[in-house]
A protein has these predicted regions:
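Active-site-adjacent structural elements in enzyme catalytic cores
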Residues: 1-213
Length: 213
């Protein structure tokens, strides 16, 4: 057995989190003696980090699989840390201070209705193609049907946030293998699980998010 077992979701801080044993082995090959495969992460954007202030209040420092709506069922007062709302100040939670969960290629995230996201991605794609860039797409089935299928990772249907949360990191890691110059990604609204998804996507994109509603 290895002398020092690794925790789940072990990773390098500047890389997307591995959510399968194969992805852990890819990152840790040559650094560890063994990887025990307990199956893929169930949610994908796993941990919600909160600060507890007495019995009746929690402050969300990093959104995750446990959503605001879930917390409100058991805690009277649930607030967001001001750094999440304003984007200013020093975040308290790990992984919130710098560009994090990031693929090798720069990424732009587009958020809005299906039609407007498709149109904006098409415009961005045409410009990048004219520059000779190789583009990767992280999109839903509906939006993906409008683009070449090479270098594309499709997570599922447009409104399936659970599928995107589950496959986000696997999708980002796939582009490191495909060697793309730029990643164009379809985001979601920040309701429910969407809050955690967009938190991770914004970090991966270095804040480069375009709203087209």
């Amino acid at each position: 057995m290895p002398a020092f077992p690794l925790p789940d979701q072990c990773q390098f801080i500047d890389r997307p989190s591995p959510t399968t044993a194969a992805e852990v082995m890819h990152d840790m090959d040559g650094r560890v003696d063994m990887v025990i495969d307990g199956g893929p992460c169930h949610i994908g954007v796993e941990s919600t980090i909160v600060e507890c202030s007495g019995d009746d209040k929690v402050t969300i420092l990093r959104p995750g699989g446990v959503t605001i709506e879930m917390l409100k069922e058991i805690v009277p007062v649930v607030e967001m840390d001001t750094t999440l709302v304003t984007g200013k100040g020093v975040p308290k939670a790990p992984g919130m201070k710098y560009r994090h969960y990031a693929p090798s290629a720069p990424m732009t995230v587009v958020v809005g209705t299906e039609d407007k996201v498709t149109a904006k991605l098409q415009s961005l794609y045409e410009g990048l193609k004219a520059e000779g860039k190789t583009v990767g797409f992280l999109v839903s089935e509906e939006v993906g049907s409008h683009f070449p299928h090479k270098n594309m990772y499709v997570w599922g249907h447009h409104d399936d946030k659970e599928a995107l949360a589950n496959q986000l990191y696997t999708g980002l890691l796939s582009f490191d293998s495909d060697v793309v110059d730029v990643i164009l990604a379809e985001g979601v609204d920040d309701e429910g699980l969407g809050l955690a998804i967009m938190n991770r996507m914004k970090k991966a994109a270095g804040g480069h998010v375009i709203l087209v509603d």
